[in-house]
A protein has these predicted regions:
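Asparagine-centered strand-capping/turn motif at beta-strand->loop junctions
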Residues: 7-11
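Short acidic/proline- and small/hydrophobic-mixed sequence motifs that coincide with surface turns
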Residues: 13-15, 57
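Short strand-edge motifs at loop-to-beta-strand transitions and within beta-strands
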Residues: 78-82, 94
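Short Pro-Gly-centered flexible turn/kink motifs
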Residues: 2, 89-98
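Short aromatic-acidic-glycine turn motif
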Residues: 24-34, 164-168
C-alpha cells in the first residue's frame, strides 16, 4: 500500500508529535489489546491461532521532510508515534507518505478479514488518531466498532481480478 496522508493542526498549540492508528497490526500476536479483549470474552480461538491466521502490518517507510523518527508504542502495537523535527504550528500542516503491507486476519475472530471466498475490510488503512483540545486520543482496536477519527477525506484506487467484486458502504462525494 502506498498512502499519502495530510494532517492540519486544528489544535490551539504547536504539535511536536502526531499519532497514527494501525489497526491491521492489532492482530499480530497475543500481547495486543485486541488479543487480550478476545481472551477476556473467553474465546481461545485467537490464543491458539496459527500465525497464518493472524493479521499484521509491515511498514517499509514513513517519510516527510519533517519526520525525525517514528515508533510503535510498546504497550499498544497498533499505535504509531511520529516524532517531528519541528513542531507543526496552529493551522500548519504536514504531508506524510507511508509504504506498507497488510496481512488480513481470518474473519472468524472479529468478522473482518478473509474467509474461504471473501474479504471483509474495515479499519484496515492507517489513519490519524483523534485530537481534541491539543490532546491525542489514541485508540487501540478492541473490536468494538468504535474507531473515532479525525474528519478526513479519502481517495482510494483499488485494483483486483476481474472475477472479484467490490462492495462498499462508503459515500461517494464529487
Amino acid at each position: 500500500i502506498y498512502q499519502i496522508m495530510k494532517f492540519k493542526n486544528t489544535s490551539n498549540t504547536p504539535l511536536k508529535e502526531i499519532f497514527l492508528e494501525d489497526w491491521s497490526n492489532s492482530y499480530l500476536d497475543n500481547t495486543t489489546s485486541l488479543a487480550k479483549r478476545i481472551s477476556d470474552e473467553y474465546s481461545r480461538s485467537f490464543s491458539f491461532a496459527q500465525k497464518k491466521q493472524r493479521g499484521s502490518s509491515s511498514i517499509n517507510n514513513i517519510k516527510s521532510n519533517n519526520i525525525e523518527t517514528w515508533e510503535r508504542l510498546d504497550n499498544t502495537l497498533d499505535i504509531i508515534k511520529v516524532n517531528l523535527k519541528k513542531p507543526i504550528s496552529t493551522g500548519g500542516s504536514i504531508e506524510i507518505e507511508i509504504y506498507y503491507s497488510i496481512k488480513l486476519p481470518d474473519s472468524k475472530f472479529t468478522g473482518y478479514g478473509y474467509d474461504d471466498d471473501n474479504f471483509y475490510l474495515k479499519n484496515w488503512l492507517i489513519v490519524f488518531s483523534n485530537i481534541s483540545n491539543s490532546i491525542w486520543y489514541n485508540q487501540s482496536n478492541l473490536n468494538l466498532d468504535d474507531q473515532s477519527l479525525q474528519k478526513a477525506g479519502y481517495e482510494l484506487k483499488i485494483s483486483f481480478d476481474e472475477d472479484l467484486h467490490l462492495f462498499s458502504n462508503l459515500i461517494k462525494n464529487n
